[in-house]
UniProtKB/Swiss-Prot annotation:
Protein name: Trp operon repressor
Family matches, as Pfam families: Trp_repressor
Molecular function in Gene Ontology: DNA-binding transcription factor activity; sequence-specific DNA binding
Alphabetical list of InterPro entries matching this protein: Trp_repress, Trp_repress_bac, Trp_repressor/repl_initiator, TrpR-like_sf
Organism, scientific name: Salmonella typhimurium (strain LT2 / SGSC1412 / ATCC 700720)
Function statement: This protein is an aporepressor. When complexed with L-tryptophan it binds the operator region of the trp operon (5'-ACTAGT-'3') and prevents the initiation of transcription. The complex also regulates trp repressor biosynthesis by binding to its regulatory region.
Gene: trpR
Domain of life: Bacteria
DNA-binding region: 68-91
SUPFAM superfamilies: TrpR-like
Keywords: Cytoplasm, DNA-binding, Repressor, Transcription, Transcription regulation
Cellular component GO terms, alphabetical: cytoplasm
């Protein structure tokens, strides 16, 4: 049995608050058309590339035409990354999944 210390709970809460602060900052940046410079400031080129790859993974998983192995070859992503994307998509709220289908697959 694993016990969670108050210290680890406090750290988790602090990290969650920092994440929510970033999300709010990004929302404000979009409202003021500063989102691209903000994201370029906050993310390295590798992180931006990884996010683009993750969008492609979700898109292809939603499309359902390729196996995870085919996605690995097509995108050059690790099988673990694709599996995490698949697991995250399975646990995503239905509303989010429908929204993603509408946005990512509308031109398919």
């Amino acid at each position: 049995m694993t016990q969670h210390s108050p210290y680890s709970s406090a750290i988790a809460e602090q990290r969650n608050q920092e994440w929510l602060r970033f999300v709010e900052l990004l929302r404000q940046a979009y409202a003021e058309d500063l989102h691209l410079p903000l994201l370029q400031l906050m993310l390295t080129p590798d992180e931006r590339e990884a996010l683009g790859t993750r969008v492609r993974i979700i898109e292809e998983l939603l499309r359902g035409e390729m196996s995870q192995r085919e996605l690995k070859t097509e995108l050059g992503a690790g099988i673990a990354t694709i599996t995490r994307g698949s697991n995250s998509l399975k646990s995503a709220p239905v509303e989010l999944r429908h929204w993603l289908e509408n946005v990512l697959l509308k031109n398919a």
